[in-house]
Amino acid sequence: HVVKTLETAVELARTNMIEARRSVGALRPQSSEGEDVAAALHRMTDLTRRTTDVPIDLTIGELPPLGGGVEREIIGIFQEALTNAVRHARARKIAIHASAVRSLGFRLSVADDGRGIAKEHRGTGFGMTSMQERAERIGASLTIVTAPRSGTEVVLAWEPPSFSIPGPVHAAR
């Protein structure tokens, strides 16, 4: 009984260490200097294809111009979503779609056909929190759709802030 308890404690410590390292890594997206979102998505997807047997379908449409800060956060969210799909979902396939929305907005979807996220684990990991914080920093919405044994889809939607142009100023007479 003591040996079993120790084995469980060691495995729990190992799992927590892996999660902590992954979370710290997620704070700094692994992108090359000056790399845009499309290039980063291609590079990270290619790297993941080389290191896993999970087929990944990547579709990138026309993308709007994004600022450097927005790009960094989007790349970080993508990295975390892809990592989660590979490491935790036990997915048989992953589909990634990135495109412009209403010409200036951006939409990213990372969907897998894995085991989904159990209700009691939703929003409890460092990775999910990190993605949500990144989305909030750029004013984006992050939606996670999941159900046990039905996979998970992470959807990021971003639109640039709207700027109102004031009407003509009339001088008082």
Label every PLM stretch briefly.
Residues H1-R173:
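Coiled-coil dimerization/phosphotransfer module
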